[in-house]
């Protein structure tokens, strides 16, 4: 899980979602997981 000030989809499998007011990227590739913070 990377924590970045700006989250962007890396590949075409990445999905940008909102959970509890946080913007997150979920993907089949676990290395692409990101959270804004």
UniProtKB/Swiss-Prot annotation:
Lineage: Bacteria, Bacillati, Actinomycetota, Actinomycetes, Mycobacteriales
Alphabetical list of PANTHER family matching this protein: 50S RIBOSOMAL PROTEIN L36, CHLOROPLASTIC, LARGE RIBOSOMAL SUBUNIT PROTEIN BL36C
Family: Belongs to the bacterial ribosomal protein bL36 family.
SUPFAM superfamilies recorded: Ribosomal protein L36
One Pfam family here: Ribosomal_L36
GO cellular component: cytoplasm; ribonucleoprotein complex; ribosome
GO molecular function: structural constituent of ribosome
GO biological process: translation
Species of the source: Mycobacteroides abscessus (strain ATCC 19977 / DSM 44196 / CCUG 20993 / CIP 104536 / JCM 13569 / NCTC 13031 / TMC 1543 / L948)
Name of the protein this chain belongs to: Large ribosomal subunit protein bL36
Protein keywords: Ribonucleoprotein, Ribosomal protein
HAMAP family: Ribosomal_bL36 (MF_00251)
């Amino acid at each position: 899980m990377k924590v970045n000030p700006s989250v962007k989809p890396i590949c075409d499998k990445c999905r940008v979602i909102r959970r509890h007011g946080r913007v997150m990227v979920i993907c089949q590739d676990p290395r692409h997981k990101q959270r804004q913070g």
